[in-house]
Amino acid sequence: MNLLIKGGRVIDPSQGIDDTLDVVVENGLVKEIGKGLATSAGAETIDASGKYVVPGLIDMHVHLRDPGLEYKEDIISGTRAAVAGGFTSVCCMPNTKPAIDNKAIASYIINKAKTEGACNVFPVGTITQGMHGDRLAEMGELKESGCVAVSDDGKPVKNSELMRRALQYAAGIGIMVISHAEELELVGEGVMNEGFTSTELGLKGIPRVAEDIATAREIMLAEYVGAPIHIAHVSTKGAVRIIREAKGRGVKVTCETAPHYFTLTDDAVRGYNTNAKMNPPLREADDLAAIKAGLKDGTIDCIATDHAPHHLDEKDVEFNEAMNGIVGLETSLPLSLKLVDEGVLNLSQLIEKMSCKPSELLGLGRGSLKAGNVADITVIDPAKQWTVTESALASKSKNSPWLGATMAGAAACTVVGGKIVFSGR
């Protein structure tokens, strides 16, 4: 399929481009970008007037639940949700059943995604075997099989010596370690952020310091061995400060946050709303402000969703018993566009955090519209108004705290490898 994407505002931070231009796609690759372009006879033309044309969005942190938990989500439904949200690539976390701790599981995911998925899927392998936290996984084998990072996401690696060795080994073979930073003894039986709201609701709280201490440990270990570390789903003002200070002294630390941490506070839990229960939990207003400040000054490198689908039966229970996590692939873009409206980021900075930087950190070879690159492209309609409903979501699971909310902004067209895989709501 050959394409001419015409008259859109092309924003490509990798090339410093922000202008009204045309994009020509031929044989699955970007052929050229410029004004007044034409393409071969029979090419499909996409009118991008009034829209943004950007490198395909990349979500470096999703849970596709495949294999083993397909009643929540699978590669087919998860990638359909991804392209509906404008994502052309996703990185799937390894807390599946069985976990992605060997070549066979990684190969299964890659092969299924190639034959049945709607977008690129890059698996993340485990740090430890079975995510049990006692023995390192075969990281070299995982990298060779196509894993782009390693993580025990969903829980931390408690053993500091094991984490030190993981960082050393991963650095030696050139694969990123993604840390779920959480001090479990401080978390205890907590189910939401510790503070005024948890006290008022009579729910056991999780103190911010549980994340802060674990973040500091990871940074100190990485600094000690001279290895890179990536901190997942940053949610506290303390973690932002610790990461900012570490970057200032040259530590190879990067991090991500998720849209719910810069749009919601723990007030969303009122009414015991289980669709506002996730890990890390929603924090307070000063944490939200710190997350925005971290995005603005570059402390926070990436925006990821931590898309975590759960079946209704796992959410329609008492708050204490409900599973942690929310779906986020289809709401991430409009929520993140609010950062531009608020002056936190400009459009180029937003696309950098949602496409270019994730690709750079994980070595995906995406995140750019340079001629010759794979044509992964997202066309964004910033004026599109739509309502989040269960029927509007492509994900198998509907556990979103924004059900019933009206969103501004959506993917108008998602192109993966030169093929149109989604054409708007």
UniProtKB/Swiss-Prot annotation:
Annotated binding of Zn(2+) 2, by residue: D153, H180, H233
One Gene Ontology cellular component: cytoplasm
Gene Ontology biological process: 'de novo' UMP biosynthetic process; purine nucleobase catabolic process
Catalytic activity: (S)-dihydroorotate + H2O = N-carbamoyl-L-aspartate + H(+)
Listed InterPro entries: Amidohydro-rel (IPR006680), DHOase (IPR004722), DHOase/Allantoinase_Hydrolase (IPR050138), Dihydroorotase_CS (IPR002195), Metal-dep_hydrolase_composite (IPR011059), Metal_Hydrolase (IPR032466)
Pfam families: Amidohydro_1
Protein family according to the UniProt entry: Belongs to the metallo-dependent hydrolases superfamily. DHOase family. Class I DHOase subfamily.
Protein name: Dihydroorotase
